[in-house]
């Protein structure tokens, strides 16, 4: 799948524009602050209904504009296309449209337009809180396991009920026991989905990483959020008093984590920033391979400021791996020459010059 058309209005400093991207490689180049990252942000908004630069969408809306809007036409792998649209105004009203119909949730966007983001903050996947790694893990499970979303919703409902009971004691014993059973059932299913996903991801990740950088002894493991030798029901019963004191459930899938270690050490404590970026790139490219194996279609990769913290050899290796995925890629850089020569001669490459919010599609030398 790929975006064949993107229209952006009212996003940060960007002038209204309609782009016709290449189905493969798209390079956005220009000076710092010109608006390159805002183009990626607009595409991210279209696919996830969130910004990767701000937890709030109000700052995304251009100064003195009433709203921001992004439309896109997605060419589907199975043929045909789907039209997506997102809009957010200053009053907080958010609208998602799919093929002319209002959508119920952003998950419907994500299912049609799976996006992967690689940017200067990517190292947070290793250094940041477990929540970031759970989001990474669950993105992958969501795109390969059709039952994940409904099970996840069951888990969240049961967890919310239990936490409310822990804080306020509003349930009778029978109701509390029923919600605990539902929590344990949903937790076991989520754990099963996650374990199966990590089992599939590990060999692909290890192969991908070996083509990017040599890191002997790096291991990836999964912690499910409670003792692997015990049933969750047993753990919940034994930790009930402490859970009541804390006001929330301390064991379960909501405490899961991915652990990357180099020998006996946390990888984030040992690796350089450049090495961390390569590890994250390998993880996200491996996810793309799994998506392509399970569903007809590929992820779309948004790569912001690729040259930073990577030398020429590593940049070329990363470009080669992205190219081998045969997916659509949007990459930003200051100097197009960093990336222009990194592709095979038969790979369609489009160049976009961004200057003070204006985007001009230029011609590649292969055209």
UniProtKB/Swiss-Prot annotation:
One biological process term in Gene Ontology: SOS response
Alphabetically ordered keywords of this record: ATP-binding, Cytoplasm, DNA damage, DNA repair, DNA replication, DNA-binding, Nucleotide-binding, SOS response
Pfam families xref list: SMC_N
UniProt KW Iron keyword: no
Binding site for ATP: 30-37
One of the record's GO cellular component terms: cytoplasm
Compartments reported by the entry: Cytoplasm
GO molecular function annotations of the record: ATP binding; single-stranded DNA binding
Homology family: Belongs to the RecF family.
Function, as annotated: The RecF protein is involved in DNA metabolism; it is required for DNA replication and normal SOS inducibility. RecF binds preferentially to single-stranded, linear DNA. It also seems to bind ATP.
Name used for this protein in its record: DNA replication and repair protein RecF
Species: Pseudomonas syringae pv. tomato (strain ATCC BAA-871 / DC3000)
Gene name per UniProt: recF
């Amino acid at each position: 799948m790929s975006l064949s058309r993107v229209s952006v209005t009212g996003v940060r400093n960007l002038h209204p524009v309609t782009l016709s991207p290449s189905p493969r490689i798209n390079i956005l180049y220009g000076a710092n602050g010109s608006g390159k990252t805002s183009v990626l942000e607009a595409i991210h908004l279209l696919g996830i209904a969130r910004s990767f630069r701000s937890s709030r969408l109000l700052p995304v809306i251009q100064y003195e504009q009433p709203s921001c809007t992004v439309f896109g036409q997605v060419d589907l792998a199975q043929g045909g296309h789907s039209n997506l649209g997102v809009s957010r105004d200053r009053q907080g009203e958010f609208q998602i449209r799919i093929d002319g119909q209002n959508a119920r949730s952003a998950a419907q966007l994500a299912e049609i337009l799976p996006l992967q983001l690689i940017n200067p903050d990517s190292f947070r996947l290793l250094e940041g809180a477990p929540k970031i790694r759970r989001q990474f893990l669950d993105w992958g499970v969501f795109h390969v396991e059709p039952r994940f979303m409904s099970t996840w919703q069951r888990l969240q409902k049961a967890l919310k009920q239990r936490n409310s009971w822990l804080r306020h004691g509003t349930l009778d014993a029978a109701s509390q026991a029923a919600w605990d059973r539902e929590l344990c059932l949903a937790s076991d299913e989520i754990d099963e989905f996650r374990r199966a996903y990590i089992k599939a991801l590990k060999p692909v990740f290890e192969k991908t990483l070996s083509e990017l950088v040599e890191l002997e002894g790096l291991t990836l493991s999964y912690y499910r959020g409670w003792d692997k030798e015990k049933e969750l029901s047993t753990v919940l019963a034994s930790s009930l008093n402490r859970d009541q004191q804390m006001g929330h459930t301390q064991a379960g899938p909501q405490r899961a984590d991915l652990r990357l270690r180099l020998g006996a050490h946390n990888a984030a404590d040992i690796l350089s920033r450049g090495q961390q970026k390569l590890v994250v790139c390998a993880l996200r490219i491996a996810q793309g391979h799994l998506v392509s194996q399970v569903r007809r279609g590929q992820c779309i990769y948004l790569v912001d400021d690729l040259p930073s913290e990577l030398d020429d050899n590593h940049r070329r290796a990363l470009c080669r791996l992205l190219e081998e995925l045969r997916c659509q890629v949007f990459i930003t850089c200051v100097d197009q020459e960093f990336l222009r020569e990194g592709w095979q001669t038969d790979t369609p490459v489009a160049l976009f010059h961004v200057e003070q919010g204006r985007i001009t599609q230029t011609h590649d030398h292969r055209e």
